Structures are given as C-alpha cells and as structure tokens.
C-alpha cells in the first residue's frame, strides 16, 4: 500500500491497468456499464486520454456519426487510438492537425472549435468564446451569424478555400450536439484517476466508504448489490449483520478481507433503531431468548425493524443457532402476548428459578406463576401450543434466505437461490476470471436481461439477449444468447428466475460466455 503520494502525479501504472481492464465500479464518471465498456475499448493511459474517454461516453457523442465511416465519434476515436488501419487518422484540412492531433482527428472539445476559429478565421478571444457559447447553448440563429463571420475570416486570412471553410464550419456546427468543455473533462479525469487510485491502493476502505454512501444514490439497493458483487470479484467478502457485529454502518475486519454489513442499510431498520442497538454492550454470546428479553423488548425495537433483523441473521450467533424461520415464527407468537405478559416473562428470565431456554417454556412458566385473567388465558394457552406444535416447517431453505436478504440487504450474502440445486459444475467467479473450458454449466439467478434485435446476419431483425447472472460465488455480467437459442429458451430467460445455463467460452472476450441451452431449475 502506498501511504505517500503526490497529488499531481498521474503515472501509477496499476491505476491505469485497473481503468483499462474496466474494473471501474465506483470510479468517478466510469462506473456505469457504458463506462466500463469504453474504458476497456479506449484504454486510456494518461489524464488527457482519460479526459477524452469521459467526454466521448456522453450520449451526444455516442449518437453522433462520422459521415464517412458511419461509426460513432466514440468508436472512431477508439479505433484510431488503437491504430486500426481501417480507420486512419484524417483531417478535413492540414491546418487542423495541430489542434486535433491529441484526439486522433475527432473534434471532442468546445475549446478545439475555438482554436480552429482563431487560427483559420482570425477570431479574437471574445469572438472565439462567442462561438463556444453558441455551441454550448445550441443557438441556431447565433451560429448562422458566426458562420458568416467565420467564412469571411478564412478568406481574409487566406487559410482555406470558401468551400473548405464552409465544410469545416459545418463540422463544427454538428459537434454542437456533443462537444464538451475540456477544462471540465480534465477536472473529471483527475477525480476519476484519484478514485481509481483509492480503489487500487486502499481497496477495503474504498468499498467501505462507497457502501456507506450508497444511500445517497437514487436506487441504493442496486448500488449496494453492484458494490458487493464488485468487492467479491476483488476477493473481499461482505458478511450480513450478526450478533458479534451489530453496528450502524459497514465496518472492516482489520485482519481479514471482510466487510460487515451496517444495520442502517438494512431495509426497515431506521436510524433510531440503530441508535438503540449502539447502546448495547457485548451481545455476541446471547441466546435467542436473550435477544427477545434483553434486546428487542427492553430497547423497544419496532416490529418492522425486528422482523428485518431476524430475516437477515442479525440475531444469529455463537449461542443462537435457531433458524431464521423459527425466530420469525416465535417473534410473531411473542407479539401476540400483551405488554404485561411480555414484561412478566422478561422478569422471570432474570431469576434462575424461573428462567427458561425456550419461549415455549417461558410461556409455560408465565401460565404457572402469573395471574392471567380469563379473557387472556385462552390466547396465552394457544400461543404456548403453537410454539410447541408449529403450524409449518421451521427449517431454513436457501431460496427463502436468499430471497429475504435480496429484499432487505440488496443482495443475498449467506447463500444463493440456486444453492439447493447441486447440479452446476462451474461458478460465475471462475468463469468471469477467464476459465478456459470447452463446456460450462452454471446454476444461476438472472439479474438482468437486455433483448435486442439483430441488424446484420442472414435474418436481421431477430431477437437475441445479453444477461447478467449470479450464483453464490459472484456475478457474471457478460452472457450472450444468439437468436436461435433465445427463441428456443426465452420462456425461462426471465429476470430473477433460477436456471441452468449450458455455455461455451466466447472467443472474443475473456470472461464472457455464449449460451447453448437453458433449463428451469
């Protein structure tokens, strides 16, 4: 780990490797799937190239097409930077080379338009700035006025012919749909570099910080899931809340590659409940009865928060091995008791002579030692009977645990929905790292599916799909299903469905697979 660094030094090769490999979740301006993709495609190795990358992945640039190649300006830049001989660097006029050389002949910035106007048409700084404003504000009437001045200026300067001047200005005018402010782009690139630096050299702290700020995002549960999956791919596990680690925020294990989930980020557990929990001393050795009588009842943990905490395993620990389903069942039974009856059980638990190991026994002691009026007695006896003879199976199952954790934590941490189906031979984590096998079988949950129509091939217009899937080892984001396969199995290829995928590795991209067959689990 680097403890000292120069704020103006942008030459850390490990940081650039991280960006170029598309490991950019949490990296400023590059954390979207679009950012990851183009970071790999463009492969920037310095701040100037990173500034261009950030500018080029804006919607306008991606939509703008080069008239000659019909490629987007973003793709054209990437091809030219990579030295693709099918897309050589070209300039409308030789005088543009010094201005556009650093962006491989692609007009990326508003400042480039200003320089062109100054050098070719003799614009002063104010006139060039008027051009920049017209580009930024997309004012057609102002652009027309400046065009006349530009063409006239080139003729007076004798730099290019009138036809070339009109062509160049037309090019500048089209750039108004996407050209970005370079000073902003460089500032963004510097921020992106330093966030990537933190991810490279302060990995655990990076994830802890970003996870604790996930609630600032519009869809915090999606942000949490993406960060946790990204952390897994980097070798860092995130554990759900537990009795030994009941804390408000995400916290690090200083000795292991572990981060513990913060209660504040559990859906249904508010800040007030967290503040109550923080007042507790060591509860790591509490039993389930202790949790009821020493935590939930005395702290007045509200019902919604208690159910959420039970459902994600927050009350599980060294001396509480009860299933979550059983704890939820018994908590529901506890809530059927009156406040007076609950308080009586709490008091009984303080005395060795009346202390019980189970809630069923505690209710029995309540019936024997406490005066209960006739109207309540039937209810209390029914509660005791239901505790002794539950109405349904109280064992935990992978599907139910994973479903509840996904709902309340943002993703499943203890297990996956497919853990009960011991049929897969491969895991997402290994495949994402580039496992080379002829045949791959994955038992997965489908996180997302994007259906598109083919443009080329024998039968253009057919549907194909791109999936993001996961199992308990991690996430696999690059899963491709071609038209013929998608048409056959589309009925099981649904978001949140659990399926078996039979695949082969893609020859084009490491960590990517092509699906040949899908089967419902």
Predicted regions and their residues:
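Noncatalytic, beta-rich nucleic-acid-contacting surfaces in large DNA/RNA-processing enzymes
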Residues: 1-521
């Amino acid at each position: 780990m680097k403890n000292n660094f120069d704020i103006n030094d942008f030459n850390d090769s490990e940081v650039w490797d991280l960006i170029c490999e598309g490991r950019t979740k949490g990296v400023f301006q590059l954390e979207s799937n679009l950012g990851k993709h183009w970071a790999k495609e463009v492969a920037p190795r310095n701040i100037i190239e990173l500034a261009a990358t950030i500018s080029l992945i804006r919607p306008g640039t991606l939509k703008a097409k080069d008239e000659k190649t019909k490629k987007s300006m973003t793709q054209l830049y990437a091809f030219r930077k990579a030295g693709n001989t099918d897309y050589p660097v070209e300039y409308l006029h030789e005088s543009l080379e010094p201005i556009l050389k650093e962006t491989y002949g692609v007009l990326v910035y508003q400042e480039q338009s200003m320089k062109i106007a100054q050098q070719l048409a003799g614009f002063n700084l104010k006139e060039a700035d008027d051009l920049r404003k017209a580009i930024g504000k997309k004012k057609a009437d102002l652009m027309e006025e400046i065009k006349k001045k530009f063409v006239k200026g080139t003729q007076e300067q004798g730099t290019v012919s009138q036809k070339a001047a009109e062509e160049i200005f037309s090019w500048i005018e089209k750039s108004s749909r996407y050209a970005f402010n370079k000073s902003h782009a460089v500032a963004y690139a510097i921020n992106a570099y330093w966030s990537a630096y933190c991810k490279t050299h302060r990995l655990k702290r990076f994830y802890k910080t970003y996870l604790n700020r996930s609630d600032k995002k519009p869809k915090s549960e999606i942000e949490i899931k993406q960060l946790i999956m990204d952390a897994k791919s980097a070798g860092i596990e995130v554990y759900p809340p537990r009795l030994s680690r009941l804390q408000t925020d995400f916290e690090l294990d200083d000795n292991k590659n572990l981060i513990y989930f913060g209660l504040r980020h559990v859906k249904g557990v508010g800040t007030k409940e967290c503040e109550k929990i923080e007042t507790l001393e060591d509860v790591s050795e509490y039993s389930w009865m202790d949790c009821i009588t020493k935590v939930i009842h005395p702290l007045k943990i509200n019902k919604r928060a208690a159910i959420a905490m039970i459902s994600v395993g927050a009350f599980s620990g060294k001396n509480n091995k009860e299933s979550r389903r059983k704890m939820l069942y018994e908590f529901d039974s506890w809530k059927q008791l009156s406040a007076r009856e609950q308080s009586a059980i709490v008091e009984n638990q303080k005395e060795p002579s009346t202390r019980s190991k189970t809630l069923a026994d505690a209710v029995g002691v309540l019936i024997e030692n406490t005066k209960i009026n006739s109207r309540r007695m039937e209810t209390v006896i029914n509660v005791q009977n239901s505790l002794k003879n539950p109405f349904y199976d109280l064992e935990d199952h992978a599907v139910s645990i994973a479903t509840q954790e996904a709902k309340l934590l943002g993703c499943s941490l203890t297990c996956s929905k497919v853990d009960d189906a011991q049929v897969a031979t491969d895991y997402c984590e290994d495949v994402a790292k580039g496992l080379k096998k002829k045949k791959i079988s994955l038992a997965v949950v489908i996180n997302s599916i994007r259906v598109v129509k083919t443009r080329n091939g024998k039968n253009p217009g057919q549907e194909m799909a791109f999936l993001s899937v996961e199992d308990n080892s991690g996430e696999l984001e690059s899963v491709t299903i071609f038209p013929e396969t998608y048409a056959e199995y589309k009925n099981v290829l649904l978001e949140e469905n659990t399926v078996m995928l039979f695949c082969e590795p893609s020859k084009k991209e490491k960590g990517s697979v092509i699906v040949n067959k899908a089967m419902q689990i």
